[in-house]
């Protein structure tokens, strides 16, 4: 089994990188209830789910930052486990936004791919080291390089 995967913080639509207005980095805009401005999920694309079906545990698990200073209770969610979310939903999002130097003052503030790209990062690395999971930001283009291997 691979000891790490790289996940995008964006989606693709017709070959273009995009941050949809009501999902992933902008989950706070989704309908249904009032949401925290930092509510996000990390997309798990089908090519990752198909190539690494047993990478994530079935139940919730602890995801630590690489420096070990922060940890999040996370699990895969949504249909076909296509999203990685924290509980509460805003914990992981707040860490991601802080690391990227991006701010959302209101749930309806939308982050676009150009803003994400300008930070120099557009993906995350999730490592499984001896059954413990770690997250770190990865530079622009890392996800594409990973899936081309």
How would you label these PLM feature ranges?
Residues 2-134:
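Polyanion-binding interface signature
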Residues 137-139:
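Charge-dense, extended regions
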């Amino acid at each position: 089994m691979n000891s790490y995967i790289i996940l995008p913080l964006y989606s693709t639509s017709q070959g273009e990188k995009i941050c949809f207005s009501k999902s992933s980095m902008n989950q706070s805009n989704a309908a249904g209830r009032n949401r925290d401005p930092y509510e996000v999920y990390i997309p798990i694309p089908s090519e990752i789910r198909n190539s690494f079906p047993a990478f994530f545990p079935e139940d919730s698990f602890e995801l630590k930052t690489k420096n070990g200073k922060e940890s999040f209770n996370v699990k895969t969610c949504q249909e076909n486990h296509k999203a990685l979310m924290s509980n509460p939903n805003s914990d992981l999002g707040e860490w991601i936004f802080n690391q990227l130097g991006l701010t959302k003052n209101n749930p309806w503030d939308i982050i676009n791919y150009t803003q994400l790209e300008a930070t120099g990062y557009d993906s995350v690395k999730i490592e499984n080291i001896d059954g413990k999971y770690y997250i770190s930001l990865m530079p622009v283009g890392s996800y594409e390089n990973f899936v081309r291997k």
